[in-house]
Amino acid sequence: MNLRRRIRNSQEERNFSVRTSKAGWAVRGTAVLLAGGLAFCALYMTETAMAAPETKAAEAGTAGRELPEVSGTAAQDRQELPQVTGAAGRESDNSRGEAKLSLEVSYGYGNNAKGGRYLPVDVELSNSGTEAFSGMLQAKTMESDGTVYQYEYQVQAGAGEVMSARYYIPLGTGGDQILFTVSGEEGKTLVYKPVNLNVSRDVPEMYIGLLSDDPGELSYLDGAGINYSTLRTRTFELDEADFPEEEIGLDLLDVLVVNDYKLRNLSEKQIAAIMYWVHGGGVLILGTGERVDDTLGRFAPELLDESYGAPNLRHINLGENFALDEPGAGMLAVSCVDVSLHGGNVILSSSGFPLLTAAAKEQGIIAVAAFDLGDIGAFCEKNSSFLDFMFTSLLGENRINRLAELVYSGNSDRYWSVQTLIDTGDVDKLPNLFLYMAVTAIYLVLLGPGLYLFLKNWDLQIYYRRGVLVLSLVFAGIIYMMGISTRFRSTFFTYASIRDVTSDYVTDTTYVNVRNPYNRPYYVDLAPEYSVLPITSSYWGGYGNWEELTAETPWQTEIVATEEHVRIQGQNIPAFTSRYFRLENKSDNVEQIGFDGTVDYFEGEIGGSVTNHFPFPVENAAVMLYGNMVLLGHMEAGETKNLADYELMRFPLGNSYVVADRITGERDFGATDINNKEYLLAMERSNLLKFYMDNYLTGYTADARLIAFSSQKEETLFLKDKAAETYGVTMLTSSMEVNASRDRSLYRSVLMKEPKVVSGSYDSAVNSMAGMEPLTLEYQLGEDIDVESLTFESVNEEFLEADRNSFTDAFTGSIYFYNYGTGNFDLMELEGQTLDVEELRPYLSPGNTLTVRYVYDGIAGYNDLQLPMPMVAGRER
C-alpha cells in the first residue's frame, strides 16, 4: 500500500515537473513573441513619426508663418479684417502704427477676364507708415471643380513707398472673383480686398489684342459675331512698354493683330514670347501694305519662302468668294504686297492674287494679309458679316468650337487626358501577391490546427487564446515588414514630361500627379524657374452649385512663389488624392542640345538626314510629317541617320493609338503583363505619345517633327528636393523644316485647307466618312499654284490590320470627279495612279477646286471609313 502510494506520488511529482517545465517554455516563448509584437508596434510608431517630414513642417507652419485653420472656425482667425471694396485698398488699423497699407488691383485687359486662362493681375501696395513692410500677398480663387486654390507671393514696401508688381494667376472656368489679402511676417492679416471679375457669361468671347500705332483704324474688329455668333470678338489695345516678355503674359488672348506697327521696337524676348504663344495655340495676324517692312520684316527669314516685293496699288475684290448685296461693292483700290508664306494656305484671294494667307505653326496659326488691315475698315463696317466669313475661314469651325466650349467645360478634356496619362505608378511598388498568399496560408494553418495541436500535445490548451493573440501580432509584424519596400512614406509624384528643343530655347512641359499617403497637411518644393498651372475638371453640377468663396473659406491647395522655390501646399485633402499640375520652364539652349537636319519630301519620296545632339542615346525615334512617318528607332549620341534608308509610312489621321503603338513597340507584346518592365515602359511611352498627338499635333502643318524618348531618368528635374520619390517618362521633340519643292514646283497635302462638304457626312480631323450615304467634297488645291499632278495616297495596310478592333475601316468603293464640261460625275480609276494636268483639266474649276464623290461599296455600318490622302504638285504662280 505504502509502496503504491509512493509510486503514485512520484508519478504525480514527475508529471507536475513536466507540466511545469512545459509551462515555463511556453511562458518564455510567449514572452518572446509578445516582446516581438511590442517591438513591431514601437517600430510602426517610430516610422510613422519619422515619415513625411514635410507634413510635420506643414503642420507647424511654412516659411515662418502659421497655416490657416481648416475648420469652420476660420472666421475667428480673421478677426477685424479691414474690408477694401473700392478701387484702392483702405488703410488697415495697426495697433502699433508701424505700417499703414492700402491695396489697388487691376486685372486682365481693361478689367476683363476669361476663365481657364492665366489672368494678368497688376498690384500696387502702398505703405503710408513710418517703417518698411515685408510680408505676403495671397490671392484666393475657386477652380472649375469647386476646389479652392490660394497663390502667395512675397511683397515688400518701404516707408512711404508704393510697390508695383504683375502676377499671372490661373483662373478656373466659372471663377468670378479673387480674394486678396496682405499679411505680415507673423501671419496676421493686415489688408483684405475681394475683387469681383468681369467675365462674360452669355456669349463666349474671342479676345483680340491690337498692336498698332493707330488702333482706331481697327475698331471694326470689336463686337463682331463669328460663326453664327458662336463667338463674339472683343478687342484690347496693347502698349509696347507694357508688352509681356513671356508667353504666359499673352495667354488671355486668342488672337494678336499687328498692323501699322514696327515690330522691331519689341525686344528679342518679347518677339520670342509671341512665337511661343503661337506655338501654344495663339493666332497671329500680320497686316502689311505700305508698312510691310515694319510688320513682316522682322519675321521674314523664318516665315517666308522668298523675299516679298515692293507694295503697289492693286484693285481687289473682297466679295469674290463672299456674297454681297450690291455687285461690285467689294471692289477696293489698296496698296498690296505679294507674300509667299512658307507652308501657307490661301484663305482669301482676288483674281488669283492671295489676299490672306495662313500657315499652321504647331498648335497655332500665323496669317499674313497682303494689305493694311485698316484699309478695309470702312468696307467691314458696312458689311459686318464679312468679318464672320474671314475669321471662320481662317480659324475653322473646330477651333471656333473649342474656344466656345472652353467657357462651359473649361479644361475638362485636358483633365481627363492628363489623368489617364499620369494616374499610374512604379511597378516595383506593387506587392508580391504570391508571397502574401503564402504567408497568409501559413498564418491560417498555424492559427488553426497548428497552434491547437501544438498546445494540446503539451497539455497547454488553456493558453490557446493567448497564443492566437501573440501569433496575430507576430504575423502582423511580418506583413508590415514585407510591405516596407512597397510603402509610401512621404509625398510622391508620377509625371510625364515633354521637352521641346529649338536652337535657341529648351521648353520643358511636365504634367505631374502629386499625392500624399497621409490625411495631414503637406508641402512640396519645386524648382523656382517653373510656372504652375492646376489642371481641374469642371464641376458636374454646373456654375453656382458650389459654396460661395469668402474670406472664411479654407483653401485646399496653396502655391507659394519665392526666389528660392515654388511651394505647393495641401490641406484638407484625403490620403492618396490626386492633384494634377502642368509645370513649364523655358531656358536658353546653352549646350545646343536637340535634333537637327534636313527633310526633303516630294511626290511620295523622303530624303535628308537627322542628327542626335543630345549627350545620351534616344529610343523609339521617329520623324513625323502630316499623315506620314519614318521610324528611326535607337539613335546614339551624335549619330546621324539618312532618311532615304528608311520606309515612309502613311498612317491614318486622328488614330493616335495605332501610330503610338507602332512607334513605341507596344503592339509587339502579347497580353497585358504588369510584371514585364519592358512592356510597361512601352505602354507608358505609348500613352505619352498618344497624349502628345491628340493635344499638340491636331492639325495640318508644313513642318516635320522628330520625336524620341530619353534613355535617361531625369525624374527630379522639376523638384527642389532631389531625394523625392518620382516615377515617369520623358519625350524629346524638335521641329524640322521640310523642303517640299523642286524647281519652283510645290508638293503638299490638299487637306491643308479643310474641304467643303457638298453632301454626306465627313470628319475633317480624321479624314473619314460615314458609309451610310455617298460623300461629296470640294477640295481646294490652292490658287497660288498651277496644278501639275494629283495623287491619292492610301494608308499603309499594317495600320489597318492593327486597327481591326477599332471603329475605322479603309474606304473601298468608287470615286467620281465632277466634270465641269459635261456637268456629270465621271468614274475614276485611281489605284496607285498619279493624274497629270491633262487628265485633270476637265475637273478643275477656274479657282483650282476639285469636286470628288465617294461611294462606299461595302455593307453600311457605324464604322468610319478612312479616305485616301490627296496630294497635289504644282508650280508657283
Placement of each model-derived feature along the sequence:
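Short alpha-beta junction capping motif
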Residues: 250-297, 360-369
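Aromatic-Pro/Gly-enriched surface loop or interdomain linker
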Residues: 115-117, 173-255, 259-262, 409
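Alpha-helical transmembrane signal-anchor/signal-peptide segments
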Residues: 52-53, 465, 483-504
